[in-house]
């Protein structure tokens, strides 16, 4: 969403403006209404582009993520996922908690044991237990096995690559394919 709305400003990890955030919220809501499970974002050094650059969402502002989470409001059973290095555990968890409180979305994050923060997982689980005692559905997920592939629309592997309606776009030039993917009928056929 960030790159789609902000272009190079997102790639350079510039702060999103209020207009950027509003545009991302519209697209996120459209995606959820079209069948997306929810919203996932990454603020970890581990996630990088193919050329080694940090992902555009690294260090995205807390207010940006909380605001985007509002797009899940009224969307029953949807998920807000945060992948983080947990530099500030209270701030990171506040994103999940606030989105869940305001929208009813399920919150999830990757729960890892980190050598440089050996007790972090216990703090995270304590925050989860506290949130669950307040009636929120927030869970840590243990990463059982790292995925070793790059997935995305311009890649050879993405969630739609085996759908005939998506395969029909394979031979189109990239810009043409993007235009077709914006078409509501094409989106509907793929989904």
Question: What is the predicted role of each segment?
Answer:
Residues 1-82:
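Catalytic pocket of metal/acid-base enzymes, prominently hydrolases
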Residues 9-19, 24-27, 31-32, 54, ...:
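Polyanionic/metal-chelating signatures
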Residues 42-45, 85-88, 144:
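Short, solvent-exposed turn/loop segments enriched in Gly/Ser/Thr/Pro and often Arg
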């Amino acid at each position: 969403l960030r790159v789609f709305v902000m272009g190079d400003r997102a790639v350079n990890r510039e702060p999103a403006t209020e207009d950027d955030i509003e545009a991302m919220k519209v697209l996120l809501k459209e995606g959820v209404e079209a069948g997306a499970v929810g919203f996932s974002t990454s603020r970890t050094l581990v996630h990088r582009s193919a050329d080694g650059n940090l992902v555009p969402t690294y260090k995205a502002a807390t207010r940006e993520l909380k605001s985007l989470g509002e797009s899940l409001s009224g969307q029953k059973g949807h998920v807000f996922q945060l992948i983080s290095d947990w530099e500030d555990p209270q701030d990171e968890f506040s994103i999940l908690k606030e989105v869940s409180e305001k929208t009813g979305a399920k919150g999830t994050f990757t729960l890892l044991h980190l050598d440089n923060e050996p007790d972090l997982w216990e703090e995270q689980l304590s925050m989860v237990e506290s949130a669950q005692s307040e009636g929120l559905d927030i869970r840590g997920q243990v990463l059982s096995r790292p995925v070793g592939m790059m997935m995305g629309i311009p890649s050879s592997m993405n969630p739609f690559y085996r759908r005939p309606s998506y395969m029909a776009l394979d031979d189109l030039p990239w810009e043409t394919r993007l235009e077709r993917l914006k078409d509501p009928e094409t989106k509907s056929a793929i989904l």
